[in-house]
Amino acid sequence: MVEKIRIIGIDPGLRRTGWGIIDFLGNHMHFVASGTLHSDAQLNLASRLHQLHKGLSEVVHQFMPHEAAVEHVFVNKDATATLKLGQARAIALLVPAQAGLPVFEYAPNTIKKSVIGVGHGAKEQIHMMVKRLLPRAEFDGHDAADALALVICHSAHRTNFAHRIKG
């Protein structure tokens, strides 16, 4: 009997954190839900991080995934922005870990290569492929679509790892 695995993907950001959930039953993918959490830019950093923590905790509690995949941050020229993104990413790692989930991390180029076949591509290409692989998927923006792409990436790596163990 094939076991259903539910995976959440998290695309962290201080302004917007995308999330997407897909069920896997054997080789079949089934879209469950996706969305974008927003933090209030008028609040201080601690309050914004709290908003993200609370929102992501509610998503994990509601959908009860088995595994989580989180995107690695990229370093840019603005050190302050990179630091804030890193703090939002810490929330994205912490929430599933607190729920007892194994957490996996993927670089943006790895995600793109898994979804569209090359490590460099436009967001539109990724979103088009997510829609092709998950025709019933609904996402409210780039961040949620990226989170779904992250789940697809993790499922490919998860499957390859399982085959290596069996072989």
Swiss-Prot record:
Record's subunit section: Homodimer which binds Holliday junction (HJ) DNA. The HJ becomes 2-fold symmetrical on binding to RuvC with unstacked arms; it has a different conformation from HJ DNA in complex with RuvA. In the full resolvosome a probable DNA-RuvA(4)-RuvB(12)-RuvC(2) complex forms which resolves the HJ.
Cofactor binding: number and manner: Binds 2 Mg(2+) ion per subunit.
One MF term in the entry's GO annotations: crossover junction DNA endonuclease activity
Name of a matching Pfam family: RuvC
The UniProt record lists the keyword DNA damage: yes
Binding locations of Mg(2+) 2: 71
An example Gene Ontology biological process: DNA repair
Keyword DNA-binding recorded: yes
EC numbers, comma separated: 3.1.21.10
Gene that produces this protein: ruvC
The protein's required cofactors: Mg(2+)
Annotated catalysed reactions: Endonucleolytic cleavage at a junction such as a reciprocal single-stranded crossover between two homologous DNA duplexes (Holliday junction)
Disulphides: none
Family: Belongs to the RuvC family.
Gene Ontology cellular component annotations, sorted alphabetically: cytoplasm; Holliday junction resolvase complex
Source organism of the structure: Bartonella bacilliformis (strain ATCC 35685 / KC583 / Herrer 020/F12,63)
Annotated HAMAP family: RuvC
Identification of the protein by name: Crossover junction endodeoxyribonuclease RuvC
Principal localisation: cytoplasm
